[in-house]
C-alpha cells in the first residue's frame, strides 16, 4: 500500500473524480474545524493527515478505511454551527452506511469503521472516564468479543489524534489505557459467575448484570493501581 495515500486523493480531487466516486469524502475540503483542536483547520486536510499517519504506522487496510471515513458527518454540519461539529459522529455513521452499501465494502472494514465513526470522540476522552463508563465504552466497541478488532479501533483513533498539525509525534496514552482496561475486563471469570448464579436460581438478564458489575469492579481495582503509580 502507498506510503503517502494522500497523494492519490490529491490527484482524484484535481481531476474531479473524487466527487464522483466518494462525494462524502470530497465535500470535507473547505469545512473548518476549531483551531484549538485542529490547527490545520480544514477537515479535508486533517483527513489526509490521518490517512498518511495510518500509512506511516503500517496499519491494515481495515484501519486505513476507518481513518478515511471517520469524519464524514463534518461535511453535513449546518453552516451556522461551524466550526463546531456537534453530533457529527452519528451523521458520520449514517453516511458511512450508505457509502458501504454503494461500494459493497467488506463487512470487516464496514463494522470497524462504524465503531470508529461513532466512538472516536469518546475514545479520545477516555482518560476522563471512570470504571463504569470505561466498561460501557468497551462493550459498545464489542471489545470483549473482538479484542483484535478493538486494537485496530484504538489504532485508528491514534491516527486521528496524531493526524493534526503539530501532533504527529504526540503520545496517545488512550490506546494503552483502554487496552489495559480491556485486560482487566477479560480477567473476570464469567463462567464462574454464571455457574454460581445458576446454583442460586438466578437466570437471564440478572446474570448479565452480575457479570457487568464484576467487570466494573475489576476495572475500578485496576484504576486504583494506576492512580498509585
Predicted regions and their residues:
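Conserved, hydrophobic alpha-helical core segments of structured domains
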Residues: 1-157
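Charged substrate- and nucleic-acid-binding regions of tRNA-handling and nucleotidyl-transfer enzymes
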Residues: 147-229
Amino acid at each position: 500500500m502507498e506510503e503517502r495515500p494522500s497523494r492519490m486523493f490529491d490527484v482524484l480531487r484535481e481531476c474531479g473524480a473524487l466527487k464522483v466516486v466518494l462525494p462524502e469524502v470530497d465535500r470535507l475540503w473547505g469545512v473548518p474545524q476549531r483551531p484549538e483542536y485542529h490547527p490545520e483547520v480544514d477537515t479535508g486536510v486533517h483527513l489526509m493527515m490521518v490517512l498518511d499517519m495510518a500509512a506511516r504506522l503500517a496499519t491494515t487496510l481495515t484501519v486505513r478505511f476507518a481513518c478515511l471515513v471517520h469524519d464524514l458527518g463534518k461535511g453535513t454540519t449546518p453552516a451556522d454551527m461551524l466550526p463546531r461539529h456537534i453530533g457529527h459522529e452519528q451523521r458520520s455513521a449514517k453516511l458511512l452506511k450508505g457509502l458501504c452499501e454503494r461500494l459493497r465494502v467488506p463487512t470487516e472494514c464496514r463494522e470497524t469503521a462504524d465503531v470508529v465513526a461513532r466512538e472516536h470522540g469518546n475514545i479520545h476522552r477516555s482518560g476522563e472516564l471512570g470504571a463504569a463508563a470505561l466498561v460501557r465504552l468497551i462493550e459498545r466497541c464489542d471489545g470483549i468479543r473482538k479484542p483484535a478488532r478493538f486494537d485496530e479501533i484504538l489504532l485508528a483513533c491514534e491516527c486521528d489524534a496524531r493526524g493534526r498539525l503539530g501532533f504527529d509525534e504526540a503520545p496517545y496514552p488512550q490506546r494503552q489505557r483502554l487496552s489495559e482496561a480491556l485486560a482487566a475486563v477479560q480477567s473476570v471469570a464469567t463462567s464462574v459467575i454464571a455457574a454460581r448464579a445458576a446454583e442460586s436460581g438466578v437466570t437471564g438478564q440478572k446474570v448479565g448484570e452480575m457479570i457487568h458489575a464484576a467487570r466494573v469492579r475489576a476495572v475500578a481495582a485496576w484504576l486504583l493501581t494506576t492512580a498509585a503509580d
